[in-house]
């Protein structure tokens, strides 16, 4: 089930968070991890991703200048989590698009948006609604291929959410393989082109040595 929702501007300013059970230490820990993740995001980061974090999964979606995070219990359908994020992103954009970009915005200025978060969370927690939404999502878009990483790798082992980082690593590896193959092909080509000439030249040198110098 959905446990918590957090909304941040891309510069790291918290805009809103859902009112949750503050006595749950494990949920508090996940929220702290989200703060760290926000500080690591760059313009090259994936616009949507899933972070595996023990018995939780943290999903996020970026729309315009805003990151939307939802913390769910592990096992909650990912396509529903992203459908939920899309719903709240659309409503937040509709309600505050002219306000949140302003430099005068204060932290958690849009906390009243929690009313919509709670209502939407309740809908996505209803089993019948879950089943209907799940079926609808699969019919319309199927299960999307979304970047998934272990949050421990991200926070403590130097992993990255950058799309370009993964892509460039792959391209580097492909480039290395291509370069090695190209070198071998060029070498084989040189041999096939010049080997007969070298053999003939060697034959005449040997013949000259045999006739005149021996």
From Swiss-Prot:
GO molecular function per UniProt: SNAP receptor activity
Gene3D superfamilies named in the record: 1.20.5.110, Longin domain
Domain Longin: residue ranges: 6-117
Vesicular compartment spans: 214
Residue numbers bearing the Phosphoserine modification: 160
SUPFAM superfamilies named in the record: SNARE fusion complex, SNARE-like
Alphabetic keyword roster: Coiled coil, Endoplasmic reticulum, ER-Golgi transport, Golgi apparatus, Membrane, Phosphoprotein, Protein transport, Transmembrane, Transmembrane helix, Transport
Family: Belongs to the synaptobrevin family.
Purpose: Nonessential SNARE involved in targeting and fusion of ER-derived transport vesicles with the Golgi complex as well as Golgi-derived retrograde transport vesicles with the ER.
Note: Present with 396 molecules/cell in log phase SD medium. Deletion of SEC22 is viable. Overexpression of SEC22 suppresses deletion of YPT1.
Descriptive protein name: Protein transport protein SEC22
Organism: Saccharomyces cerevisiae (strain ATCC 204508 / S288c) (Baker's yeast)
Gene transcribed to yield this protein: SEC22
């Amino acid at each position: 089930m959905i446990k918590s929702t957090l909304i941040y501007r891309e510069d790291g300013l918290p805009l809103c968070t859902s009112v949750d059970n503050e006595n749950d230490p494990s949920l508090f820990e996940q929220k702290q991890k989200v703060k760290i993740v926000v500080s690591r995001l760059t313009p090259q980061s994936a616009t949507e991703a899933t972070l595996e974090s023990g018995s939780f999964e943290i999903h996020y979606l970026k729309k315009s200048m805003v990151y939307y995070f939802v913390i769910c219990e592990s096992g909650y359908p990912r396509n529903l989590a992203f459908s939920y994020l899309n719903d709240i992103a659309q409503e937040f954009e509709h309600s505050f698009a002219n306000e949140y970009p302003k430099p005068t915005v204060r932290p958690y200025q849009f906390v009243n948006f929690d009313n919509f978060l709670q209502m939407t969370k309740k809908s996505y927690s209803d089993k019948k609604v879950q089943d209907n939404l799940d079926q609808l999502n699969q019919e319309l878009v199927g299960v999307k291929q979304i970047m998934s990483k272990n949050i421990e790798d991200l926070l403590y082992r130097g992993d990255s959410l950058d799309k370009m980082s993964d892509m460039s690593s792959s391209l580097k590896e492909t480039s290395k393989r291509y370069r090695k193959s190209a070198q071998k092909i060029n070498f084989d080509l040189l041999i096939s082109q010049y080997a007969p000439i070298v053999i003939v030249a060697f034959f005449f040198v040997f013949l000259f040595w045999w006739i005149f110098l021996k």
